[in-house]
A protein has these predicted regions:
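A conserved hydrophobic position in a structured secondary element of the catalytic/binding core
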Residues: 7, 105, 178
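Loop-to-helix element that buttresses phosphate recognition and phosphoryl-transfer chemistry
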Residues: 11-71, 142-160, 200, 208
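Short glycine/proline- and acidic residue-enriched helix-loop micro-motifs
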Residues: 109-151
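Phosphate-coordination/substrate-recognition cap region in phosphate-metabolizing enzymes
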Residues: 40-127, 188-212, 216
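Active-site-adjacent alpha-helix immediately C-terminal to a catalytic or transition-state-stabilizing loop
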Residues: 4, 62, 76, 150-219
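Short, hydrophobic/glycine-enriched beta-strand segments
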Residues: 3-9
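Short, hydrophobic secondary-structure boundary micro-motifs
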Residues: 16, 111-114, 221-222
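Short, solvent-exposed aromatic-acidic interface loops
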Residues: 223-228
Length: 228
């Protein structure tokens, strides 16, 4: 039976500081490290094993995956990293404090930028300190200046179909460590969630989400492992 486990990275430094992170690379906090280790221990205690892993090019997701695999005694597993599993790009909001933005432009505008399905934030300025044009990991990648959730889905799902689906069709057990919005993209597809509803789906940090799949990859069951 194909099994897909999704996990959002543990708490990052900018999660703690309530800042828009997007594609900017920040590491886990001590609490985030503990979350990742606890997730790995939970998976190990429940007897989970994996054949293949996928993650983004961002440190917080990569480190979470490594911490989980360490608890599973499975650091040797093949891991594929790809920018298409990155977090949604928050454009000109990158690095800004969410509450300070609410104070400046109002809660409704910030809600539109954060939670609308197809309205992106303002683009990242050419002179922003958060530009990634010189970041070697994105060599050859056309880096977006901003993204809506719809844009994020537009890169995540083709990657899922091309790279993760073939592994699942071989009945491999797959672990994906990624981000709130890239995981929303996968959950929307797997659980057939409407555009209007997916923006309200909250995905907590460091909590394994288990998808038990039929051979045709239809969903047999979906649950948070901590609840079983």
């Amino acid at each position: 039976m194909p099994t897909l486990v999704l996990i959002r990275h543990g708490q990052s430094q900018w999660n703690l500081e309530n800042r828009f992170t997007g594609w900017w690379d920040v590491d886990l906090t001590e609490a985030g490290i503990a979350e990742a280790r606890a997730a790995g221990k939970l998976l190990a205690d429940r007897g989970f094993q994996f054949d293949r892993c996928f993650t983004s090019l961002q440190t917080r997701a990569i480190r979470t995956l490594h911490l989980v695999l360490h608890e599973l005694k499975s650091l040797w597993l093949p891991v594929t990293k790809d920018w298409r599993l990155n977090e949604r790009h928050y454009g000109g909001l990158t690095g800004l404090n969410k509450q300070e933005m609410i104070d400046q432009v109002g809660a409704e505008q910030v809600k539109i930028w954060r939670r609308s399905f197809d309205i992106p934030p303002p683009p990242l300025g050419a002179d922003s300190p958060y530009q990634l044009a010189d970041d070697r990991r994105y060599a050859g990648v056309v880096i977006p200046e901003t993204e809506s959730l719809k844009d994020t889905i537009g890169r995540v799902l083709p990657y899922y179909s091309a790279h993760i689906v073939p592994a699942l069709l071989r009945s491999e057990r797959v672990l994906v460590s990624a981000h709130g919005n890239s995981l929303r993209a996968l959950e929307k597809h797997l659980s057939n969630i409407a555009d209007a509803d997916i923006v309200g789906l909250e995905i907590p940090t460091g909590q394994p989400i288990v998808y038990e799949l039929n051979d045709d990859l239809s969903v047999r069951d979906r649950y948070y492992l901590r609840e079983r």
